[in-house]
């Protein structure tokens, strides 16, 4: 396959630059870090909820229930503080998603997705 000169030059220029100095790479790394932090926070939140649920589920009467809640005030405070924070967070909008000019890397993302059945299914489900 013969690569057009413009595409060849763009790819050659991209390959010469240090990846860690590329602005698009830096933006994607920053977004990755943000999403990993969010995943860790949510996993911790779910773990705390499950822990409290199991403790409450093992109570046999009202007094035990009240005792479990009293013993776990810090956990309850943490759960409701985090839950309130999650409710205040706005869900991802298009402004939050880094916009990369994929054409400068000679990649037509729509064609790439259309050629891959798994990616196309994810795209149609709204997950891409």
UniProtKB/Swiss-Prot annotation:
Localization annotation: Cytoplasm; Nucleus
Gene Ontology annotations of biological process type: positive regulation of transcription by RNA polymerase II; regulation of transcription by RNA polymerase II
Keywords carried by this UniProt record: Cytoplasm, Nucleus
Broad class of where this protein is predominantly found: cytoplasm
Protein name per the record: ADA histone acetyltransferase complex component 2
Claim: Ligase is one of the keywords in the record: no
GO cellular component annotations of the record: ADA complex; cytoplasm; nucleus
Gene that this polypeptide is encoded by: AHC2
Keyword Cytoplasm part of the UniProt annotation: yes
Other observations noted: Present with 981 molecules/cell in log phase SD medium.
């Amino acid at each position: 396959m013969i690569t057009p000169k413009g595409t060849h030059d763009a790819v050659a220029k991209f390959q010469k630059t240090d990846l860690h100095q590329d602005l698009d790479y830096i933006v994607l790394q920053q977004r990755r870090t943000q999403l990993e932090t969010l995943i860790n926070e949510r996993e911790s939140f779910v773990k705390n909820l499950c822990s409290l649920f199991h403790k409450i589920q093992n109570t046999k009467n009202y007094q035990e229930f009240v005792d479990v809640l009293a013993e776990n005030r810090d956990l309850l405070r943490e759960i409701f503080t985090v839950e309130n924070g999650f409710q205040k967070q706005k869900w991802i909008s298009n402004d939050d998603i880094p916009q990369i000019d994929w054409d400068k890397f000679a990649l037509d993302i729509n064609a790439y997705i259309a050629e891959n059945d798994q990616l196309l299914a994810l795209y149609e489900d709204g997950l891409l």
